[in-house]
């Protein structure tokens, strides 16, 4: 596999590896997606837009430079700016790989941070010295204006050029609540929707606040994904229920959609409309209630994204998939190529 180092790759050259429910592997162009689905299938995408969640500033008690990466909130409500979760880095920025970033100064509750025009207070440490609760000073309008003016998209060292905010907005980006892009939706473009409609494939959206994908700290990375707020519209819940009752497949576009759909179905087995917070992890021990398949990016083994795929297929199938992706030189990470993995995936 090859790191995709720009945003995003041209649709005409992007590839799609399809892993059937029997475990068969086939290579296609990503622009053939609609032709690879069945009439009646329902695609569900995350329409969250990404906010500029990286904030540089000063830790007042020590005078040290820090980078704050906002990573979560308990709600999608715009007026709630007092309960952020954030990952704290020491000096430097995205040019340095996260695993080589310096540690931040020792953090304590009530420490104050100066982040450009913003002021924030550390409310608590979240069982890790770099994971904190943050409370911003000011009302919601002031805080969001400050984030817009001072923040920049969270970015990793494998992309060498600075990313603009529009680089991390997918074609269906709407409500600005994500901390990193729900990048599986980069596989979509406007022509895709025309082809899906002509094929008789349904399309629906939900909003899920995608969090950070990596911190560079093994202990903290092992806790990813963190709790993430979501909202499922009534029309989407209805479309999913109808598809399930009629025996049609529900294909999630990305891991965040899987988390939201599965969490929203825990109580009754049917997806409920409304707001919630996805907790826990989807993985090899998860009995999926809703998602029959996932359209996802090319992820590397031993990541939280990869672990979620084990709910769809066993280790042996994913190992063959990884070998095929590696041999064919598929491009990885948020701006890379795609995989369509259908539940089952147990075959030779």
Predicted regions located by residue number:
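A cross-family signal for N-terminal binding/gating loops and helix N-caps
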Residues: 1-348
């Amino acid at each position: 596999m090859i790191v995709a180092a720009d945003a995003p790759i041209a649709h005409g050259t992007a590839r799609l590896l399809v892993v059937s429910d029997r475990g068969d592997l086939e290579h296609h162009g990503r622009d053939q997606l609609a032709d690879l689905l069945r009439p009646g299938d329902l695609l569900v995408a995350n329409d969250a837009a990404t906010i500029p969640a990286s904030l540089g500033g000063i830790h007042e008690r020590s005078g040290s430079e820090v980078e704050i990466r906002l990573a979560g909130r308990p709600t999608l409500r715009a007026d709630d700016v007092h309960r952020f979760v954030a990952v704290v880095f020491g000096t430097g920025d995205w040019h340095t790989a996260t695993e080589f970033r310096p540690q931040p100064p020792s953090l304590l509750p009530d420490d104050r941070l100066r982040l450009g025009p913003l002021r924030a207070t550390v409310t608590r440490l979240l069982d890790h010295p770099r994971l904190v609760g943050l409370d911003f000073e000011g009302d919601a309008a002031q805080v969001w204006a400050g984030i817009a003016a001072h923040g920049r998209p969270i970015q990793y060292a494998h992309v060498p050029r600075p990313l603009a905010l529009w680089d991390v907005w997918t074609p269906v980006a709407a409500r600005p609540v994500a901390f990193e892009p729900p990048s599986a939706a980069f596989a979509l473009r406007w022509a895709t929707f025309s082809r899906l409609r002509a094929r008789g494939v349904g399309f629906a959206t939900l909003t899920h606040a995608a969090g950070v994908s990596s911190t560079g700290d093994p202990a903290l990375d092992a806790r990813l994904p963190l709790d993430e707020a979501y909202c499922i519209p009534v029309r989407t819940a209805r479309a999913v229920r109808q598809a399930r009752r009629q025996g049609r497949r529900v294909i999630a576009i990305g891991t965040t959609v899987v988390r939201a759909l599965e969490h929203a179905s825990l109580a009754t087995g049917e997806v409920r409309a409304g707001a919630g917070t996805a907790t826990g992890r989807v993985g090899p021990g998860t009995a999926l209630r809703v998602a029959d398949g996932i359209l996802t990016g090319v992820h590397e083994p031993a990541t939280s994204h990869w672990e979620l795929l084990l709910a769809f297929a066993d280790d042996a199938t994913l190992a063959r998939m990884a070998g095929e992706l590696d041999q064919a030189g598929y491009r990885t990470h948020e701006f890379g190529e795609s995989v369509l993995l259908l539940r089952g995936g147990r075959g030779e």
